[in-house]
């Protein structure tokens, strides 16, 4: 009986070795500290430490040549639409404020309501057109710079913002171009600094240690 059991164990071990499952395994003590996150099963037949298989973030299968993040062209539609809606909302509120201020001496009547409504629509369209035009120029410059350089980084953001300000204020002469470029440079630099603030803090902490 013992011989039969021994031969059975040998045959099982031989089959396990043939299929690659007879390598170095992990004991219960090794697997006790592995966190059970998600639906990841733990198997003693793995040839790697299961602790390295825990995924902190979602992983997606991307087509060949695809980027992990959206480029300037994909973000252009969201940027332009968001700026138009933001401008329309801000302009409507500003128009309501101006309409109430200009008609405060008038009693509540249909002419006053029409005047307030006209002010709301006029200011909403004005601000939506302004911010939408800026977003369109910024997105166009961003796409051109990205395609020209073949890279997507904060330099594209700052350069696109500076060129947008210069072109938007080009009708004001050299002084207007300088002011527009400086305004675009300042705003985009602050935006880039805000996006990289956590990374900069981590780098400074590592250098201090």
Swiss-Prot record:
Q: Does the keyword Mitochondrion apply?
A: yes
Signal peptide range: none
Which UniProt keywords are given for this protein, alphabetically ordered? Answer: Membrane, Mitochondrion, Mitochondrion inner membrane, Protein transport, Translocation, Transmembrane, Transmembrane helix, Transport
Domain of life the protein comes from:
Eukaryota
Name any GO cellular component annotation: TIM23 mitochondrial import inner membrane translocase complex
User: Which spans are transmembrane here?
Assistant: 73-93, 125-145, 181-197
GO terms for biological process?
intracellular protein transport; positive regulation of protein processing; protein import into mitochondrial matrix; response to 3,3',5-triiodo-L-thyronine; type 2 mitophagy
In the bilayer, the protein is annotated as: Multi-pass membrane protein
Protein family according to the UniProt entry: Belongs to the Tim17/Tim22/Tim23 family.
Instruction: Summarize the subunit comment.
Output: Component of the TIM23 complex at least composed of TIMM23, TIMM17 (TIMM17A or TIMM17B) and TIMM50; within this complex, directly interacts with TIMM50. The complex interacts with the TIMM44 component of the PAM complex and with DNAJC15. Upon mitochondrial depolarization, interacts with PINK1; the interaction is required for PINK1 accumulation at the outer mitochondrial membrane, kinase activation by autophosphorylation and PRKN recruitement to mitochondria.
What does the UniProt function comment say about this protein? Essential component of the TIM23 complex, a complex that mediates the translocation of transit peptide-containing proteins across the mitochondrial inner membrane. Has a role in the activation of stress-induced mitophagy by protecting PINK1 from OMA1-mediated degradation and facilitating its accumulation at the outer mitochondrial membrane in response to depolarization.
Per its record, how is this protein called by name? Mitochondrial import inner membrane translocase subunit Tim23
Source species: Rattus norvegicus
The beginning of the lineage is:
Eukaryota, Metazoa, Chordata, Craniata, Vertebrata
């Amino acid at each position: 009986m013992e011989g039969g059991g021994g031969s059975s164990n040998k045959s099982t071990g031989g089959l396990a070795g043939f299929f690659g499952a007879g390598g170095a395994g992990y004991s219960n003590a090794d697997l006790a500290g592995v966190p059970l996150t998600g639906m990841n099963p733990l198997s003693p037949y793995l040839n790697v430490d299961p602790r390295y298989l825990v995924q902190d973030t979602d992983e997606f299968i991307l087509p060949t040549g695809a980027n992990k993040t959206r480029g300037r062209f994909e973000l252009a539609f969201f940027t332009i639409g968001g700026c138009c809606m933001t401008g329309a909302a801000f302009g409507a509120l500003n128009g309501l404020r101006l309409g109430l201020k200009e008609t405060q001496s008038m009693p509540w009547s249909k002419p006053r309501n029409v005047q307030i409504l006209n002010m709301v629509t006029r200011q909403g369209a004005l601000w939506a057109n302004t911010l939408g035009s800026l977003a369109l120029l910024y997105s166009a410059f961003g796409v051109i710079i990205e395609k020209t350089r073949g890279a997507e980084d904060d330099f594209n953001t700052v350069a696109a913002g500076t060129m947008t300000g210069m072109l938007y204020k080009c009708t004001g002469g050299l002084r207007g171009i300088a002011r527009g470029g400086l305004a675009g440079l300042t705003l985009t630099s602050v935006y880039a600094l805000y996006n990289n603030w956590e990374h900069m803090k981590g780098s400074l902490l590592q250098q201090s240690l």
